[in-house]
UniProtKB/Swiss-Prot annotation:
Protein name (record): Trimethylguanosine synthase
Record gene name: Tgs1
Acidic residues bias locations: 424-435
GO MF term set: RNA cap trimethylguanosine synthase activity
GO cellular component: Cajal body; cytoplasm; cytosol; nucleolus; nucleus
């Protein structure tokens, strides 16, 4: 089947020199991802379990799991009548119906009932929490809509505002709590803070009694419902409802920064601007802005002339603010959307930091504002915006009244700057301009083009997928790593530069050898008597220290980079010889008695010998596991570990020759190509021009196609026939031993698959693979002959093939799709599709829409 992880990546336009744009070649770039890690791991372990067996095993386990959950109930349901008759018989005989424990059916029912109860409780908690949150939001939303004002400095108005609000909240809470079911009013497990206890001791009695009177207005005021037997239970229920309701509200508003000990000024400080100002000036601004009244009800109760005094105090407080113009302009973009709307909802004015003005009736004031805005600009705006007619605030968008104003200065309008990940390709063309397709991992060479097409003047790449650069980082595109910078010294004698590479490992080894030499010099500079004593009393500890020093040197030598650069390889031979000679000199300085007597008997030497023996045994085991034909050719050991990736039924009798190990297509990639061909259009006959051992031929036949397999080597034809018999589709394949160059004019088919030999594993060492000169036969010639059979051609090529040559196969003004085949996120091969096999983005959209309908 076709790979599920497939997508279009880009469109590449190749423009030809000295030709008009209409002759450009369109190259659609796509990627297909397949995985076969399981097959590779099985090859490393040395055994394989058939896919059919795996599927059967998986189905068996799934059936067992399903039977464990559902089969118990089903096993008892068909024999319920028998069980009932047996139970009656047992009961009539006086025998017990059950022994030891309950039946599995009852056990299952009890477990299901417990689960259902837990689910019901969980849903109840969620519903209760959601209901309370909605109730709180609705209550406060109505309060702000009905009471769009800010309290003045008058204490009486403050108390009046707070009392009205608390009464409304209590009445709403009482009416809403009545509707709650009894189960939801049970006391939840909440931590009771000390502040809540103080609050409840102070206000709880009044809240309870007020709500009770609203609930039962017919009762006398002198009655005590908590002592009467008729109303005692109702009072307890009423108490628990209000207690836990107000506790949750208290915790919610306390988390928002509200406290019952704070001044009752409706706490509008939450919506103040975040502009960086002096703390004293900011606090005075908050206090004055909070006292500014916009409600006609309160204005009527105030003393005449108080508005002018309040306005003057506000202006003087704002004038004390010292904010630089740069900070104000910088804060406009950051805090305009967070500051304008909340503060304007409270005061009916726009935030001073936003740089706009709003009159009391909601219409904008048009003012001439200079570029460098002074610090007293907000004061002027508030002074102009003062008035007697107070109206409800309308949302602020680009202008004060929600409409765009051409006279407003552009530097003060809120604007949104796109972030880097939101930029379009057209807006930032330099971000991912990739005319050579470097992000795609393509190779562009200077080889001869097909059909006499001259060189391409330039290329244009348009990416169809977002974040191609980011996604390509996690793919192994087999690119050459960039060479590190090196220090180049120019000698006076010759003009040729001398490259010097500094190795960290080399410097460490030099330091260690220098330290050892200094230590040896100190020991040799001692008196002759001490030297004789050392030779006479040489112990195993001395030899162990020297062994440790030698081991340290060996470890440093082993920690060299396993893949050094070329410059390191050139100088590594002489360096290693010098280092070995120095280490050898150290060994020579050790006294002979110690080296001949102590070291052989040391436990460290014994462990080294044992480790070497174990390594030899492991090597022998690995060699013995390989078949003789594989063990005789060391190059095939790598491919032997990948045998199940090449043929999943390898153990059923698959046969390969030496060249077949190198040239066969991995089964997952071959399966994907066959699936694409079968889904492209209705085709009956497929020609595999170079079938080899039958990797692609078998997959084409498995999709139900009639396959004509051609190869010039009779040995490969026999191997391909044997492998097809293993898969059970030999009757769908016609094997022909012959030269495709001679047989092509006589063939008729719907699709031609080309996978000529690439010249062995050495193809990967080339920077760019020339499909004309590095193939045998000529890659251009076999494509020309294939066009005589059909235009629907699949060309299977190495990953480093010259894309310009592949695109030239489409001809002037033609189209080609180049698909990158990723195996376990590693780029393995590329496949070029021609004719009706090309998947075009427009066709994909129409096909998906038709499938949805």
């Amino acid at each position: 089947m076709c790979c599920e992880k497939w997508n279009h990546v880009a469109e590449m336009l190749l423009f030809i020199e000295d030709r008009e744009e209409e002759y450009k070649i369109l190259c659609l770039c796509s990627r297909a991802f397949v995985e076969d890690r399981k097959l590779y791991n099985l090859g490393l372990k040395g055994y394989y379990v058939k896919s059919s067996g795996n599927n059967a095993g998986d189905q068996g386990t799934e059936e067992e799991e399903d039977g464990h959950s559902n089969g118990t109930a089903e096993s008892h349901s068909p024999n319920e009548s028998d069980l009932d008759s047996e139970a009656k018989l047992m009961r009539s005989m006086g025998l017990p119906i059950q022994f030891g424990r309950m039946s599995s059916h009852e056990n299952f029912e009890m477990s299901m009932n417990a689960r259902n109860k837990a689910k019901v409780k969980q849903k109840r908690r969620k519903h209760q929490k959601r209901y309370l949150d909605e109730m709180v939001r609705e209550s406060w939303r109505n309060d702000y809509e009905e009471d769009d004002l800010v309290v003045s400095d008058d204490p009486s108005s403050v108390e009046h505002c707070e009392n009205n609000r608390t009464c409304e909240i209590q009445s709403k809470a009482g009416s809403e709590v009545e509707n709650l079911p009894v189960e939801n009013t049970l006391a939840p497990k909440l931590e009771v803070p000390e502040n809540w206890e103080k609050y409840w001791n102070e206000y709880g009695e009044g809240l309870l009694w007020q709500s009770w009177q609203e609930k039962y207005p017919d009762q006398t005021l002198s009655s005590e419902p908590w002592n009467l037997p008729d109303t005692k239970e109702e009072w307890e229920q009423h108490y628990s409802q209000l207690y836990w309701y107000y506790l949750e509200q208290f915790q919610y508003w306390e988390a928002q920064g509200w406290t019952f000990t704070a001044s009752q000024n409706c706490d509008k400080d939450v919506y103040t601007s975040h502009t960086e100002v002096d703390q004293n000036a900011e606090s005075s601004l908050k206090a004055d802005v909070m006292t500014f009244s916009s409600s006609p009800n309160i204005v009527e109760d105030e003393i005449p002339g108080s508005n002018d005094n309040d306005h003057n105090e506000i202006i003087t407080a704002i004038n004390n603010i010292t904010v630089s113009a740069e900070k104000v302009e910088q804060s406009q973009l950051d805090s305009s959307q967070h500051c304008d709307e909340p503060l304007s909802e409270i005061t009916g004015k726009e935030c001073p930091a936003s740089g706009g003005s709003d009159s009391c009736n909601g219409t904008p004031k048009e003012n001439d504002i200079s570029e460098n805005r002074s610090s007293d600009q907000p004061a002027k705006e508030l002074q102009e915006s003062s008035g007697t007619n107070k109206g409800k605030h309308r949302p602020h968008h680009n202008g004060a009244d929600g409409h765009e104003s051409d006279d407003d200065p552009p530097e003060h309008k809120p604007s949104k700057v796109k972030r880097s990940h939101e930029l379009d390709v057209d807006e930032n063309p330099d971000s991912e301009v990739d005319d050579n397709g470097f992000l795609l991992g393509f190779k562009h060479g200077s080889g001869q083009k097909y059909g006499g097409i001259p060189n391409f003047s330039h290329r244009q790449v348009r990416y169809l997928e977002k974040n191609v650069k980011y996604k390509s980082k996690y793919l192994d595109l087999r690119k050459q790593m960039p060479v590190k910078s090196k220090h180049i010294l120019f000698t006076e004698d010759s003009g040729k530069p001398f490259v010097v590479c500094k190795s960290k490992v080399r410097s460490k080894v030099e330091k260690f050898l220098k330290w050892v030499n200094e230590r040896v010099d100190e020991e040799t500079s001692q008196d002759s008597l001490s030297q004789n004593k050392m030779q006479d009393t040489c112990t195993s500890s001395d030899s162990e220290e020297q062994d440790m020093s030698l081991e340290k040197a060996d470890n440093l030598m082993e920690t060299r980079d396993p893949e050094p650069e070329k410059c390191q390889i050139i100088s590594s031979a002489t360096e290693l010889e010098a280092e070995k000679s120095e280490v050898g000199s150290l060994v020579a300085t050790v006294p002979e008695n110690c080296s001949t007597e102590e070291i052989p008997n040391s436990p460290h030497a014994e462990t080294e010998v044992e480790i070497k023996k174990k390594k030899k045994k492991n090597k022998n085991k690995k060699i013995n596991d390989l078949p003789p034909e594989i063990a005789s050719v060391p190059e095939l050991a790598k491919y032997w570990a990948q045998r199940y990736r090449l043929f999943s039924r390898f153990d059923d009798g698959i046969k390969l020759d030496k060249e077949g190990w190198f040239s066969v297509t991995p089964e997952k990639i071959a399966e994907h190509i066959a699936g694409r061909v079968s889904q492209a259009f209705r085709c009956d006959v497929v020609v595999d021009a170079f079938c080899g051992v039958g990797g692609n031929t078998i997959q084409f036949a498995l999709t139900g196609k009639r396959v004509i397999a051609i190869d010039i080597d009779p040995v490969k034809i026999d191997l391909a026939r044997n492998n097809a018999e293993v898969y059970g589709i030999a009757d769908k394949i016609e094997f022909i031993c012959g030269d495709f160059l001679l047989l092509a004019p006589c063939l008729k088919a719907d699709v031609v698959f080309l996978s000529p030999p690439w010249g062995g594993p050495d193809y990967a060492t080339a920077e760019t693979f020339d499909i004309r000169t590095m193939m045998s036969p000529d890659g251009f010639e076999i494509f020309r002959l294939s066009q005589k059979i059909t235009n629907n051609i699949v060309y299977f090529l190495p990953r480093n093939a010259d894309i310009d040559q592949v695109a030239s196969l489409a001809g002037l003004g033609g189209q080609v799709e180049i698909e990158q085949n990723f195996l376990n996120n590693k780029l393995k091969t590329i496949t070029a599709y021609f004719g009706d096999l090309i998947r075009r983005p427009a066709l994909l959209k129409t096909s998906t829409s038709e499938a949805e309908v």
